[in-house]
């Protein structure tokens, strides 16, 4: 397995797909990276030589925030919303949907499982 930006990417996948294993890189960015580094996106990772792997790694480090750096930025943004006390921060703090969705019947993912009820014996 090749190691790019601290992430082991699978050898048997095409470069375009394998790059999406890195947090912060989706299909569109993976295509951009392949285009910018002149690497065929349909090539398998095991077919890449060390020079091509290092070319991809340096391009990603210079142009994108990925992995830990991106995760910390997202967490800091959420923390900032909570600290300033805005509506979105309040919703984050309560663990409810942030973007205006209804919560009367749905939103189980954000709310978590329903509290269990104890049945009375007759």
From Swiss-Prot:
Disulfide-linked positions: none
Keywords in alphabetical order: Ribonucleoprotein, Ribosomal protein, RNA-binding, rRNA-binding, tRNA-binding
GO biological process: translation
Gene Ontology, cellular component aspect: cytosol; small ribosomal subunit
Membrane spanning stretches: none
Superkingdom of origin organism: Bacteria
Gene Ontology terms, MF aspect: rRNA binding; structural constituent of ribosome; tRNA binding
Disordered: annotated segments: 98-122
Biased composition (Basic residues): 101-122
The keyword Metal-binding is assigned to this record: no
Family: Belongs to the universal ribosomal protein uS13 family.
Role this protein plays: Located at the top of the head of the 30S subunit, it contacts several helices of the 16S rRNA. In the 70S ribosome it contacts the 23S rRNA (bridge B1a) and protein L5 of the 50S subunit (bridge B1b), connecting the 2 subunits; these bridges are implicated in subunit movement. Contacts the tRNAs in the A and P-sites.
PANTHER family documented for this protein: 30S RIBOSOMAL PROTEIN S13/40S RIBOSOMAL PROTEIN S18, SMALL RIBOSOMAL SUBUNIT PROTEIN US13M
Quaternary structure annotation from Swiss-Prot or TrEMBL: Part of the 30S ribosomal subunit. Forms a loose heterodimer with protein S19. Forms two bridges to the 50S subunit in the 70S ribosome.
Protein name listed in UniProt: Small ribosomal subunit protein uS13
Species per Swiss-Prot/TrEMBL record: Thermosipho africanus (strain TCF52B)
Gene that encodes the chain: rpsM
